[in-house]
UniProtKB/Swiss-Prot annotation:
It catalyses: L-seryl-[protein] + ATP = O-phospho-L-seryl-[protein] + ADP + H(+); L-threonyl-[protein] + ATP = O-phospho-L-threonyl-[protein] + ADP + H(+). The active site is at 329 (proton acceptor). One of its GO terms (molecular function) is ATP binding. This is Probable serine/threonine-protein kinase 010L. Its EC number is 2.7.11.1. Pfam families: 2C_adapt. The keyword ATP-binding applies.
Length: 559
């Protein structure tokens, strides 16, 4: 659009935050939020501001950043992205602290007592920030689990000061925020709500601004009452479990959640009061879709995709084995990415087998558990899912032993359950098995519902297939729509073919447990990555990055 410049784009950015019907910076007319003109102006302004930042111009048009300073403002105020920590060489931080320390699972509203002085190199990062401008702290070349936990520790200390006053009245991303020290920018919207990029000045004495993501989700009046009684949304409870995986060195491929607050009025246009929750999380600067633009050498493309696929299946394995969680919405938009140096390797241990995973510069992050379900009895839900077969113990066991039940619980309105005789298949070789709290289905063998490896829920299959089809293309399993897929090397398409070509039906193959269990699938696909040496973890190897035990003993999770 002709007439747009840095000044008008800055005014447009302010207008969007103040009103859901902002005025056009060109015509002065009110524009519908997320309408075609609104989107066009937003997109063009993003380009203008990005080009201005690249030129070193002041995209904040004035001294907006100076308001965070204590005392007189500096001689000049620069753009947010103009001065980043000047890391000339990637630094890999040894993560022995994260896997050998006595770390406790995440308590509600708090991150951990992981002290920042334990993280080598953080003081050096602070000193390299520009002395007269707020800089954004990026993970790209300093990405490691201890570094993420250190940032979380600082957020915890920050929120301890405000949670008593603002726990149920913190409207950061609303049109009329209740706190003045956050600066927000909307980066995504959907039927679930809004995701915003938020800058907090908690490091202002070091002249560093740390970004984070805030997910605003609408909640009903009944959910609000439950929150007041500390019965939080299910998604946040899942996030709490996910945090424990990061704190205990189980798997790094998840988003770290900092805190949850509630806003009593999320909109200023509706006459009806709209309540929402605001979840503070790590911020990542792109989804898996961004790797389509990556230029990878032809001889490295196969290893590049295999590294990403392994890490995603490792995240699925962590939620399956440890909590019985089915994500139900795996797609490229829900796989965020963190960029690394592209050097070295990680070690993932799954059922006693250590896999050396090459670092190809991308760490996929599984996010958004809004429609996820847990079938574990320890998670508090009453539905334990369909359990059609037993998988014998052993990391290389792909056999599936079907069993039968006599009764089938059926859930009706208001979650009222009635018990009916179980149904047989036409050949009368197996029954439809479902387990529910308080109902004895009379199985033909003893069934341990908490053991997700021996008695996996049937819906585990959905996440396994969705990950493969996300790369090859195809229909989604539980949600409407299609996976667009990637331009893959033929070897990767053939690599994923055994998963993609198997239809989802009611009868399970007898020797393909890897279609349900990510732990078995990783052994089936990546057996050549297993480290068969009996040596200890190579902490002194300069190429070694971090170690994760994806399937730890149950005692480690409950300690």
């Amino acid at each position: 659009m002709n007439g747009l410049n840095v000044k008008k784009c800055y005014e447009w950015d302010i207008a969007k935050k103040k009103s859901p019907l902002p005025k056009s910076p060109l015509t002065g007319r009110k524009l519908k939020q997320h309408g075609p003109t609104w989107k066009k102006i937003t997109a063009e302004c993003a380009t203008i501001m990005r080009e201005a930042r690249n030129r070193g111009s002041d995209t904040n048009y004035g001294s907006r950043l100076c308001k965070w300073s204590n005392g007189p403002p500096p001689s000049s105020c620069y753009s947010v992205d103009s001065f980043r920590p000047a890391w000339n060489e990637p630094t890999l931080i040894n993560s022995r602290l994260a896997v050998q320390g006595n770390l406790k699972p995440l308590p509600l509203y708090e991150i951990s007592d992981f002290q920042d002085h334990q993280i080598a190199g953080f003081d050096r990062v602070l000193k390299r920030a520009h002395p007269s401008a707020m800089s954004i702290l990026h993970w790209s070349s300093h990405y490691s689990t201890p570094f993420r936990l250190m940032i979380a520790y600082h957020f915890r200390e920050r929120y301890k000061q405000i949670k008593k006053k603002y726990r149920f009245n913190l409207c950061v991303t609303a049109p009329r925020p209740t706190v003045p020290w956050f600066e927000t920018e909307e980066i995504g919207a959907g039927s679930f709500g809004v995701v915003s990029r938020v800058f907090d000045n908690m490091f202002r004495h070091e002249n560093i601004r740390v970004p984070m993501a805030v997910k605003r989700t609408r909640i009903s009046a009944s959910e609000w009452k439950m929150a007041m009684n500390r019965q939080y949304p299910v998604e946040y409870l899942f996030n709490k479990v996910i945090n424990s995986y990061l704190l205990n060195g189980i798997c790094p491929n998840f988003v770290l959640t900092y805190a949850i607050f509630f806003c009593p009025n999320c909109t200023s246009t509706s006459s009806r009061k709209q309540m929402c929750s605001e979840t503070f999380m790590e911020l990542f600067y792109g989804s898996l879709d961004a790797i389509k633009k990556e230029r990878v050498k032809r001889d490295q493309r196969e290893l590049y995709f295999k590294s990403i696929i392994f890490q995603i299946y490792a995240a699925v394995c962590a939620i399956q084995t440890n909590a019985g969680i089915v994500h139900n919405d795996i797609k490229v938009e829900n796989i965020l990415i963190a960029e690394t140096s592209g050097e070295g390797y990680w070690i993932y241990e799954i059922h006693g087998k250590r896999y050396r995973v090459p670092n190809m510069g991308i760490i996929p992050i599984l996010a958004d558990f809004g429609v996820s379900v847990s079938y574990s009895p320890t998670m508090g839900d009453k539905d334990y899912g369909r359990r059609q077969f037993r998988v014998p113990p052993g990391y290389n066991s792909y056999q599936m032993e079907p069993f039968t039940t006599q009764f089938y619980p059926m859930e009706g309105k208001n979650r009222q359950v009635r018990v009916v005789p179980t149904r047989w298949n036409r050949a009368r070789t197996w029954t439809w098995n479902k387990f529910y709290s308080g109902v004895d289905s009379k199985p033909s063998i003893p069934v341990d519902l908490a053991d997700m490896e021996q008695f996996p829920p049937w819906n585990f299959h959905n996440d396994i297939v969705d990950v493969a089809r996300m790369f090859t293309g195809g229909s989604r399993t539980t949600q409407p729509g299609m996976h667009a897929g990637f331009h893959l090397p033929p070897s990767i398409r053939e690599f994923l073919a055994p998963i993609v070509r198997v239809p989802t039906n009611s009868e399970a193959p007898k020797n393909k447990a890897w279609l349900w269990l990510a732990s078995r699938l990783i052994h089936y696909l990546f057996s050549d990555w297993i480290d068969n040496s009996n040596d200890s973890i190579p902490y002194n190897d300069p190429k070694f990055i971090e170690y994760y035990n994806v399937t730890p003993p149950k005692s480690r999770l409950s300690s």
